[in-house]
Amino acid sequence: MGEQNVIRLRGVTIYHTDDPFGSRSEKKLLQQGELILSDLNFDINAGEFVYLIGRVGSGKSSLLKTLYAELQLIEGEGYVAGFDLRKLKRREIPMLRRRIGIVFQDYQLLTDRNVFMNLYYVMKATGWKNESEIRKRIDEVLKLSLIHISEPTR
């Protein structure tokens, strides 16, 4: 993994299964689970903000849960903040989660805070120190969100 890559995925395929940390048997998953995402390949570098936008059921949350080690990576190579998702031990999960920030669209937000403050807390918790840079980055993300919301659907 390159030094600038915070996230690197190669050939990642994600299945929905009722047993996310159970058997690594692909055959079992194919019999029990539904294919969600296939052959993902991408890098996210340090300092980049990334949006996952797609239809309901397209695999956005499954991908985030895999990156956040809530779902186990079964197929492909995945590295997050220097951790190999295929070899991640349970005791390493909190360390991984302290190194990245993921904001879910709904159920995992701090309900007594607005979107700005949810993003702010993630950035502070992951080591961002410069207040003006934090505010600038969050403002950029929020402006992109408002542009997306204000565009008519086709």
Annotated model-derived regions:
Residues 85-101, 131:
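ABC ATPase NBD coupling module
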Residues 68:
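Helix-to-loop junction immediately C-terminal to a conserved catalytic motif
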